[in-house]
């Protein structure tokens, strides 16, 4: 039995999956935002409850909006303040008497897609989230790859490439990132970036959904903006694809519902790739909001 926990800023979602990777139990509880001991107790209590229900000790995986320090194991997270700087994996292991896997929630999203029936035989899957922020996860042979310092999936904190700057023009905004650097692609490729760039070029604040609607209606500014953004996506994605050469790319987050992306990227990518580079299959993520808990559970599949 595989147990997955999607630990968010307001709620913890639990899911239990059997050996066929079918979800057989679900539960949601509020996240303890201030009391760390209660946070650990809440997770441990759910584990004990479902161990008793299923008569086995489930394998436990946690997905978090952050990462473990690769040297100390301390948790780096801002969305779950009670756990910031704490040793959640080690403390939970001591509490329940078994090993626990923990990973970034974007890696869990990618892992969930990689273990979909349609993709599970793909040697590599890249998950990219076009949501409030831009992030991603890398899956090789069914396992999440976190790298030496646990930052391998932090694709949003790579910098905007030089040809993207040329594309955006000499008055392109140099945006500061929450990580402390400037020019991180998180601020440009996310849904938030989609809106910020529109406001920068046209002096008008609009929600992404309204820009997309205006584009469909033929509004000149929206049409120009979407064309610029699609080319920006192609330039930045081509950089990532040249580095990692994934077989399949699954897109999630609110902006991934913009169907034009799946028409435009295959046409725009080739000129930005190496001459021998191939455009990977680009699909919309299938598991939506349940992806985090699925992926967390599946951290234990290939021990």
Swiss-Prot record:
<dbReference type="InterPro" id="IPR043129">
    <property type="entry name" value="ATPase_NBD"/>
</dbReference>
<dbReference type="InterPro" id="IPR000600">
    <property type="entry name" value="ROK"/>
</dbReference>
<keyword id="KW-0067">ATP-binding</keyword>
<dbReference type="GO" id="GO:0045127">
    <property type="term" value="F:N-acetylglucosamine kinase activity"/>
</dbReference>
<dbReference type="InterPro" id="IPR049874">
    <property type="entry name" value="ROK_cs"/>
</dbReference>
<comment type="function">
    <text>Catalyzes the phosphorylation of N-acetyl-D-glucosamine (GlcNAc) derived from cell-wall degradation, yielding GlcNAc-6-P.</text>
</comment>
<keyword id="KW-0479">Metal-binding</keyword>
<keyword id="KW-0862">Zinc</keyword>
<protein>
    <recommendedName>
        <fullName>N-acetyl-D-glucosamine kinase</fullName>
        <ecNumber>2.7.1.59</ecNumber>
    </recommendedName>
</protein>
<feature type="binding site">
    <location>
        <position position="177"/>
    </location>
    <ligand>
        <name>Zn(2+)</name>
    </ligand>
</feature>
<dbReference type="GO" id="GO:0008270">
    <property type="term" value="F:zinc ion binding"/>
</dbReference>
<keyword id="KW-0547">Nucleotide-binding</keyword>
<feature type="binding site">
    <location>
        <begin position="4"/>
        <end position="11"/>
    </location>
    <ligand>
        <name>ATP</name>
    </ligand>
</feature>
<keyword id="KW-0808">Transferase</keyword>
<feature type="binding site">
    <location>
        <begin position="133"/>
        <end position="140"/>
    </location>
    <ligand>
        <name>ATP</name>
    </ligand>
</feature>
<feature type="binding site">
    <location>
        <position position="179"/>
    </location>
    <ligand>
        <name>Zn(2+)</name>
    </ligand>
</feature>
<dbReference type="GO" id="GO:0005524">
    <property type="term" value="F:ATP binding"/>
</dbReference>
<keyword id="KW-0418">Kinase</keyword>
<keyword id="KW-0119">Carbohydrate metabolism</keyword>
<dbReference type="Pfam" id="PF00480">
    <property type="entry name" value="ROK"/>
</dbReference>
<dbReference type="InterPro" id="IPR023505">
    <property type="entry name" value="N-acetyl-D-glucosamine_kinase"/>
</dbReference>
<dbReference type="GO" id="GO:0009254">
    <property type="term" value="P:peptidoglycan turnover"/>
</dbReference>
<feature type="binding site">
    <location>
        <position position="157"/>
    </location>
    <ligand>
        <name>Zn(2+)</name>
    </ligand>
</feature>
<feature type="binding site">
    <location>
        <position position="184"/>
    </location>
    <ligand>
        <name>Zn(2+)</name>
    </ligand>
</feature>
<comment type="similarity">
    <text>Belongs to the ROK (NagC/XylR) family. NagK subfamily.</text>
</comment>
<comment type="pathway">
    <text>Cell wall biogenesis; peptidoglycan recycling.</text>
</comment>
<dbReference type="GO" id="GO:0006044">
    <property type="term" value="P:N-acetylglucosamine metabolic process"/>
</dbReference>
